[in-house]
Amino acid sequence: MNKLVNLTVLTSVAVLSACATMHKDSAAHLAVVEKITINAPAAKVWAKVADYGDLGAFHPAVAKTEIKSGTNNLKGAVRLLTLGDGGTVNETLTSYDAAGMSYSYIINESVLPVSHYSAKIDVNAISANVTEVVWNADFARKDSSATPAKGQDDAAATGTIHAVFKGGLDNLKKITE
């Protein structure tokens, strides 16, 4: 009986230790949602957002967008964003719905402090001349250690994505109203 109890205790300790180690080295699941209401028809707003191969059409931080492989606006297209500061972001289009005015993408490589990043942008008609744009993302911070480097923690990751989305959406409103 004692051998069985000891074996059970040892097994439990081993499982708990393994779980603690796995948790220690994994970053939390993070999410960001930004929305903006624009006083313009949805078709006009979508016309600025629709071209996966030209994020700079509405996002002021993007100096250049290049389709590196695949076909623009088709699932699997890979784009390379060059930011104003010279940093780059490599992304893959995972879905595109022109009729539904939305697309989704993932980040493959980036200067941003995020990993396992997937995002979606939706343009929704509220009325004939009012549109809501919703940009959301799920991700983890790039530094998955228990003690991330300065500027690589959860707050930095979510703050960066909030700023990216807000900068793009604010400019989209400015150029379409």
Predicted feature locations:
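Hydrophobic ligand-binding cavity/cleft-lining segments
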Residues: C19-T71
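Soluble non-cytosolic domains of exported or imported proteins
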Residues: I36-A43, V49, G53, P113-V114, ...
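Bacterial N-terminal signal peptides that target proteins for export
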Residues: M1-V9
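Bacterial N-terminal signal peptides
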Residues: T8-S17
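A mature extracytoplasmic/lumenal domain signature
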Residues: V49-D51, H59, D85, S95-D97, ...
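Glycine-rich portal/gate segments that line the openings of hydrophobic small-molecule binding cavities
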Residues: E66-P113, E132, G167-E177
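A conserved amphipathic terminal alpha-helix motif
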Residues: A20-T21, E132, D138-E177
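Hydrophobic/aromatic beta-strand elements that line small-molecule binding cavities or substrate pockets
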Residues: E34-I36, V89-S95, Y117-A125
